[in-house]
Amino acid sequence: ICPFFLEGGRYTLNNVHYVREEKMLVPAGQTEFARDKSFSYTSSHLGEYVEEKSQGLYKKEDCVYISLEELRGLRLDEITEKLIKAENFCKIIVNAVDYTDVEIFCICWIRAVKAGKNFLVRSAAALTRVIGGVCEIPLLTREKLVDPKTKNGGLVIVGSHVKKSSAQLECLMDSD
């Protein structure tokens, strides 16, 4: 589980997931996202979140935690070993507050995969950007999104029932 997403103001520190709201970091369980009608939750600590969402099937003390200290201390062998030893659908929590943290984690993840380990991943866009080697690009312009020579349409998927998503959708619908 790696919900770090710099562009969306999402950070995980000491296993607690935070959302940047203006100049404050708010524990995710205290934000409007936690009250989403489709997938509400109360826990900001990701181990507790796992326990809550699995209705106790997976316990927070059984999760594997990858700390910022391990990542920033470049303890690659130690992290890789943790990943290799994880079994029985064990939940792995990745702390990250910067893309460098995710990049270091991905080195260890790739090492574990090369050692024969398989993973099912739940993450924000940052992990897929790093593992895929996708470069940062500016936001797409209208010219990049719409080709006036074609009558093909487009698809916009809105995936959350929160005020912020509704405001973003409204802004999109009001634009040319």
Segments from the language model and where they lie:
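Cap/lid and interdomain-hinge subdomains that line or gate substrate/regulatory clefts
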Residues: I1-V102
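Short acidic, glycine/serine/threonine-rich loops at helix termini
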Residues: R10-Y18, E103-C108, G132-E136, A167-E170
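Conserved active-site and cofactor/substrate-binding residues in soluble primary-metabolism enzymes
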Residues: Y41-H45, L74, V97-I104, R122, ...
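A generic secondary-structure signal
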Residues: K53, E81-K82, C108-R111, C171
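A C-terminal functional module that forms or caps the active site or interfaces directly
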Residues: G73-I79, C106, K114, G133, ...
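Active-site pocket-lining segments that scaffold enzyme catalytic pockets across diverse folds
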Residues: C90-R122
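Acidic, glycine-rich loop-and-beta core segments that form the ion-binding/anion-interacting portion
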Residues: R111-D176
